[in-house]
Amino acid sequence: MKITLLPGDGIGVEIVDAAVEVLDAAAKKYNFTVEYDKKLIGGAAIDAFGTPLPEETLASAKASDAVLLGAVGGPKWDNVDPSIRPEKGLLNIRKGLGLYCNLRPMKVSKYTAHLSPLKTERAEGADLLIVRELTGGIYFGTHNEAHLNADGVEEASDIEMYTRPEVERIASFAFEAARKRGGKVTSVDKANVLGSSRMWRKIVTEMRDKEYPDVELNHFYVDNCAMQLVLNPKQFDVVLTNNIFGDILSDEASTIAGSIGLLPSASLGDGAGMYEPIHGSAPDIAGQGIANPLATILSVAMMLRYSLNQDAAADAVERAVDEVLEAGYRTPDLWAEGLKKVSTAEMGKLVAEAVK
């Protein structure tokens, strides 16, 4: 199995190194072989090649079974031409790989529930997966910048549009994911106002009735879903959303977990999937050995499950993370009195040993 490693910028190098140690441990235990190809992306690529996504990086990613990304960006590149900002590398590799499905799991364990802004009893045990459509909707519709209309009034517009195939492929992924989890999909829309949402709801309902009768389906308006995530996050299993609603709801859900240092993500298409923590490059702590690698390690677990077909290894990595947290080990961002403070590399080693 070939994995393209994209450490990127800031703490990306440290957290990817820790995650690779865990992946190697899983490969050894479950008897599969991993080959790595390390490439540049983001600011590091700008410094070396003058572009945030060199051709050789994209070529490597396309030839891989999966891509593991650290993080991109930092103040060093704030004043470069907007067309070559580090974040452009991320957008362009997603486009180049044809990634249309973003997965954002949010799980609150008993070891981390106290970090949530919600009451512990409300947050603990929450375990949901947001399935967000990535390539359609208002972000990719027709954009009309501010201009004067025929009446001399300034106006601007952005068009939300989806096609049936776009809805079907993302809904299919959500239903399949639900079959492997709690068997429930909550589809989010604004069908009381938007025509695109009414079509979305119709297609999702048809698919459930025809292809997934074993999966429970309910529909929430996006405003109600945002409220229910706070009131009772444990009611959700798989949350299916369009692009803009998923952008907002996934960030809301991440705050419930209490620490972005624990949250992985995956972006999938028909080829290689890309896996990354949801946090940024944190250049202020880069090189100090204090970054939390657990989100990247849990992204490796997602990679094992969704791209490498190694479900047992994925389960083992997730169990190993829980075991290390249960034993009281924490990186500085999660440390409190009575716990054992460890470095980035030490945390990676502890999880790798727990996998073994």
Predicted regions and their residues:
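Buried hydrophobic positions in well-ordered alpha/beta secondary-structure cores of metabolic enzymes
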Residues: 9-12, 65, 131, 174, ...
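Glycine-rich phosphate/nucleotide-binding loop
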Residues: 43-46, 229-329
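N-terminal glycine-rich phosphate/adenylate-binding segment common to multiple enzyme folds
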Residues: 47-157, 244-246
